[in-house]
Amino acid sequence: LITDQPPLPPEAKTVHMYPGQGSQYVGMTADLVQRFTAPAQVWAQADETMIQVLGGETLSGFVLRSSLSKEELKEAEHKLKQTEYTQPAMLTADLAIERTLQAYGHAPDMVAGHSLGEYAALMSSGILDMDGALRAAAARGTEMGSVEIDDKGLMASVTAPYEAVAATLEATEGYVIAANKNSPK
């Protein structure tokens, strides 16, 4: 990595953290795949597994695409929002980034993941192999996508002091809760 910061002291530890579902987008890691071998190999390996799981489809066929028309982009984005695709695609992107870093000597001392990112942490640490993790993530996504609820509710991200949010929630009728209390305010 190129940085203008001083090097870390030898006793410093490095952690690689992996996100959960929600940070995906069409084209994620495409820039890495075009420049480096390691992420291209990860996507190729993922496609070998996912062709079996998705009935002949590949993840890279819609995730790594570029120069799309508006209609093609809309179609790819729609597919990527379906959890049975989202979860293995995010997992593959996480591992593609990880393997790129490792190819250049950047191995973590520790790993952590949020929700789906826990699978990536388990893969990175050697506990899960890629094939098994992808199959588990796809099954998890399929099950999540099959849940039918009459009122799916809504979610909002609010950047405000928690006290103000709590007061608003208390004054609101119906079932409204703060799921995460992680605003910088």
Positions of the model-derived regions?
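FabD-like malonyl-/acyl-CoA
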Residues: 4-171
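Gly/Ser-centered flexible loop/linker motifs
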Residues: 165-183
